[in-house]
Amino acid sequence: EIKYLFVKKSHLIREIKVALPSKKSYEIALKKHSSSSFAEKIGIPVPKTFRVNDKKELDDIVSELSYPVVVKGERGDSSSHVRYAHDFDQLKRSFDEVFQLEKNIESASLPPMIQEYIGGPTYLTQALSQNGKVKIIVPHYKFREWPITGGVSSRAKTIIEPRLVEYMTRMLESLDWHGEAGMEWKYDKNRDDFFFLEMNPRFEGSLDLAVKSNVNFPSLLIDLMDDKNISDDLIYSPSVHYRWLFRYDFRCFLHNEFGISTLLMESIDPRINGELSIEDLGLLRCFWKSPFNEITNFIRRSN
């Protein structure tokens, strides 16, 4: 994991190159408690958040809660440490469950936080910064995600959204960020604003979409590690569609997130990019079993 580079980098072979922010900034970004507090401090909208020291203190905030609420741990990938509670009993159970998951992670030290639920839709921004200056931000809209309650993009498109760019720029420059980063957002139509959910100090799972929109983040990161000056004139292509059918979206289909007609129409829509194109037919042998395995596992879980 990246955190070990901060511990070991002074002992690494001199020729090994990295592109990292400061250890303090990295730890703020890594932990959801810290990144949410930091975003709020610099004026970025965040969901209403309650922080308690243990389950007993949930009684102190019960009158202030409006269900559903989100129980969110410090860590956890792809929303694995996130639960949704629709009443107080479920909140207590979810708190215990997430807290137990957190105890299995060395760097997680705080109890779960309770957040206001914002229905969405969900947006994601990917960026690269050099010595505190943002070089490029690529925002995208999530049509679908896996798990369907919130997670990795499974069908998305790049968009133009100045507010997301402004919020992410403010966050990264306030952290004096160096390297790649991603941030997730929810849009609340009643307040007509975007709310910060979390920051990932790494490449996002939806990296393919950014690359397809003409921003090759891995190549730019290599340039960053080589101490090359990154251009201020990088431009991404908006309205680029992408679907991660084999990895995620077929699971959404199996869980009735969309129907067979959508599956077929999106499969033949030339505007929608994916893991494979006609030029990649030679790679199909690596993927063709995946949907069948998903169907088999789905049937087994249903029985």
Question: What is each of the regions a protein language model found here?
Answer:
Residues 1-51:
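Conserved N-proximal alpha/beta basic substrate-recognition cap immediately N-terminal to
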Residues 39, 64-84, 104-120, 137-139:
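ATP-grasp fold ATP-binding core
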Residues 46-51, 69-97, 122-126, 145-156:
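Glycine-rich phosphate-binding loop of ATP-grasp-fold ATP-dependent ligases
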Residues 58-61, 223-303:
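Peripheral (often C-terminal) accessory segments that flank ATP-dependent C-N-forming ligase machineries
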Residues 79, 143-147, 153-155, 200-214:
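Glycine-rich phosphate/pyrophosphate-binding beta-alpha loops
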Residues 93-147, 156-171, 187, 194-195:
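Phosphate-binding site of ATP-dependent enzymes
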Residues 108-109, 113, 178-182, 231-237:
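Flexible, glycine/charged-enriched surface loops at secondary-structure junctions
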Residues 173-209:
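Conserved metal-phosphate-binding beta-hairpin within the catalytic cores
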